[in-house]
């Protein structure tokens, strides 16, 4: 069997790439080798259910899946954070940060089984050849010729030869292991999680009318984070009617052996998050699964090669689930991979691009790793984390999303034009990241019970989410906006270094100026 592209792994990264390539080049020959079987079960399948703006744009707009997402998945009421107070027995007394209404530019809660089943059916309808329950036995990379993959499908041993090999096989890390590309991620965090077959609503934690009225849509639709020293607990709703619950922790502060079963995790929740434990207890009879990763984070020495192989998704880099960046990195990587493949098939020399894209992607990953280093010990402190969350939101919306939505991360000519701006930006990130790592725990009792509403107030009155809809007439206008956003970061950095509460700059929305 011959193909232009063979993708090892038919999960979210691999199927998304196949869909992306067929949309851009309908006659491209793609073979996908997936070890699992279809259809996948809904709910109790994979984590990574929470998407943010980049991933939502990639799946909905770039892959043209918005109709399915709107009909079969759930809208996301942003990220929501609750910080500790006393014994965490009264949620109304916890500092809360989150939106009271849906953002202008949407994000989604994705039932991974349901979404991947639909995506699988779409790529098959697009003409992609997909082998489910296919086990890769060997990969022979031939830089001077066509690569060859041997795999077992049912009782049959088969071979596919191809111009490009893409490893999207997740934690199997086929090419990374074959080529010795493993790299430590410098984070020591773990997670346990489970799904409940019920619509668990965290608003049921209190019948306080004023607290319940803070949000229009139910808090259930947020990715909810219950924060504490060295940990956070998530509650994420799924379109199938189930709820995903997880505990993520710093391995140096919490012992995975104390939560590596459902009963142990319940005991841990009773001690640290009693209201979360009580809410889960109501639905324990609906338990669908339980899984655990003791040490989930890692990087990669190289992800793209001029020898016509690429690594994407969790096969390459996985950082941390906090802020839900997993699918964003699928989007970034697949954009680079797709561009390399299509240019090569048009006869272009992609060797310089492969080196440049590899550098840009791994630098993106390095920046995000830096945002998490030394962070988990501060999770229990509302003042520090308010600063951190607001700062990181400007980084994400004002720079990362701005460049992605305008398709500039793989525009090397444009990146060359903003080299000075990116150097300023990187210096800012490192300076503030170092500050947060060194910052002492500063307590402010006045924060108890406060609500930072990210729908009604914005830093300096600018809704950076809404500004993602601005259409720029040319690159000069986009660069001007980028400089404005970096200027905002510079102003915030001064306050952060002086331990001044930057939430005081939250203001009602001012009208966005046209580009």
What are these regions (language model features)?
Residues 340-515:
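C-terminal helical "tail/cap" subdomain of flavin- and related membrane-associated enzymes
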Residues 8, 167, 311:
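Redox-cofactor binding/interface segments in oxidoreductases and associated redox assembly factors
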């Amino acid at each position: 069997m011959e193909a232009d592209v063979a993708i090892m792994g038919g999960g979210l990264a691999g199927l998304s790439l196949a869909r992306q390539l067929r949309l851009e080049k309908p006659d491209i020959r793609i073979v996908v080798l997936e070890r699992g079987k279809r259809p996948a079960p809904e709910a109790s399948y994979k984590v990574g259910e929470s998407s943010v703006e980049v991933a939502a744009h990639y799946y909905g707009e770039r892959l043209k899946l918005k109709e399915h997402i709107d009909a079969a998945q759930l809208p996301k009421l942003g990220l929501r954070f609750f910080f500790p107070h006393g014994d965490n027995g009264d949620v109304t007394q916890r500092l809360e940060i989150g939106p009271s209404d849906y953002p202008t530019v949407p994000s989604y809660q994705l039932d991974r089984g349901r979404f991947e089943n639909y995506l699988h059916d779409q790529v098959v309808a697009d003409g992609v050849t997909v082998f489910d329950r296919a086990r890769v036995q060997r990969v022979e990379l031939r830089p001077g010729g066509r690569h060859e993959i041997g795999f077992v499908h049912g009782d049959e041993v088969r071979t596919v030869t191809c111009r490009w090999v893409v490893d999207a096989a997740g934690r199997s890390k086929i090419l990374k292991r074959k080529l010795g590309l493993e790299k430590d991620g410098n984070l020591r965090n773990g997670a346990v999680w489970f799904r409940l077959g019920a619509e668990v609503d965290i608003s049921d934690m209190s019948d306080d009318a004023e607290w319940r009225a803070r949000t229009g849509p139910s808090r259930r639709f947020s990715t909810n984070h219950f924060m504490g020293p060295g940990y956070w607990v998530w509650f994420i709703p799924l379109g199938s009617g189930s709820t995903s619950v997880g505990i993520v922790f710093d391995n140096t502060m919490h012992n995975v052996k104390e939560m590596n079963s459902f009963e142990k995790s319940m005991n841990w929740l009773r001690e640290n998050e009693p209201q979360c434990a009580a809410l889960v207890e109501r639905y324990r009879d609906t338990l669908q699964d339980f899984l655990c990763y003791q040490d989930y984070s890692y990087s990669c020495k190289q992800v793209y090669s001029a020898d016509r192989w690429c690594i994407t998704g969790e096969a390459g880099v996985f950082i941390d689930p906090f802020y839900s960046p997993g699918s964003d990195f699928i989007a970034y990587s697949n954009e680079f991979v797709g561009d390399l493949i299509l240019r090569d098939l048009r006869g272009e020399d992609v060797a310089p691009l492969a080196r440049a894209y590899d550098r840009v992607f791994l630098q993106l990953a390095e920046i995000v790793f830096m945002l998490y280093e030394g962070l988990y010990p501060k999770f229990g402190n509302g003042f520090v984390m308010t600063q951190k969350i607001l700062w990181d939101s400007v980084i994400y919306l004002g720079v990362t999303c701005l460049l992605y939505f305008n398709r500039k991360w793989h525009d090397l000519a444009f990146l060359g034009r903003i080299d000075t701006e990116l150097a300023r930006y990187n210096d800012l990130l490192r300076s503030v990241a170092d500050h947060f790592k060194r910052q002492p725990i500063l307590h402010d009792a006045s924060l108890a019970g406060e609500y930072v509403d990210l729908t009604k107030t914005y830093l300096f009155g600018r809704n950076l989410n809404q500004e993602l809809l601005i259409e720029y007439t040319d690159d000069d206008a986009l660069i001007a906006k980028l400089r404005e956003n970096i200027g905002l970061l510079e102003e915030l950095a001064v306050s952060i270094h002086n331990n001044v509460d930057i939430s005081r700059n939250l203001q009602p929305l001012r009208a966005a100026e046209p580009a």
